[in-house]
Amino acid sequence: MTETEDPWGKLGQWFPEITDTSWTALRQYTSLLREWNGKINLVSRKDMDRLETKHLAHCLTITHFLRLMPKAQILDVGTGGGLPGIPLAICYPQARFTLMDSIGKKVMVLEDMVEKLGLKVQFLKS
């Protein structure tokens, strides 16, 4: 993909099963992630120009196969910048997600993000 191509258009082609509501929240999440990543290293800064096509696409690949029952419980260990936990929590609102990381600052930032996104996600600091 060239720099002039729209990563969101490409993602929409790759993941047609994702709802418009989820796409809106995913865009908001990547915006928040970029904002916070300038202050605290959540994701490798060298990858930020390819955030959607590298990290987000990898997280969403499982949506082609995974069907979750209501109230299914998912644990994201070593979540870092909330990947894959937050994108999956956006796509699977019927499930219960817990994100765990050993770095307290990252957990605090992620708590702020999920509050702004209106997600019901729990956190553990290991």
How would you name each of these model-derived features?
Residues L60-S126:
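Conserved SAM/SAH cofactor-binding pocket of Class I
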